[in-house]
Amino acid sequence: PTAESTQYGKQDYTVVPIEGLDLADQLHDGQNRCTLAKAQRGAELFVFGLAKKVILADSIGALWTDIIGAGGVGLANVSTPLAWLGIIAYSLQLYFDFAGYSEMSNGLAALLGFDCPANFNLPYISGSITEFWRRWHITLSGWFRDYIYIPLGGNRKGAARQLFNMFLVWAATG
């Protein structure tokens, strides 16, 4: 949400890792308490994530807003090079927002004594769309695989059904 807005949508709550029963097991495991090493790792993750969000994402986002915003150049008047700069700025803002939120979430979990899986793995260096999907919001794609794609039959029921299942997952992810 913006500073001027108090409206929150589903996108404001879906950038953190999605945990299933693996985390529930940690709730009952007495050995999974917070240790000094885990707290240090958690604090580092949180601080680096906060820096990515506040210093990088917000600053780069301001550039995007200056280019397309009402007080800025505006889409109707933007030159081609400036439009490309805006596209790159927006892509980097998304990247650092998501990376920052994911690291902050994992850092807080570690501070509380929990181990959460990595949720983000440098997706912009991917060599294909498939690899990009596997690197961006890792836990969300795993959730859709485990709870939608595989129960529908995955790739075990022929090519046509596999394409249909993939389409349903893509439609469900928005």
PLM features: residue spans?
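Membrane-embedded transmembrane alpha-helical bundles that form the catalytic cores
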Residues: 1-174
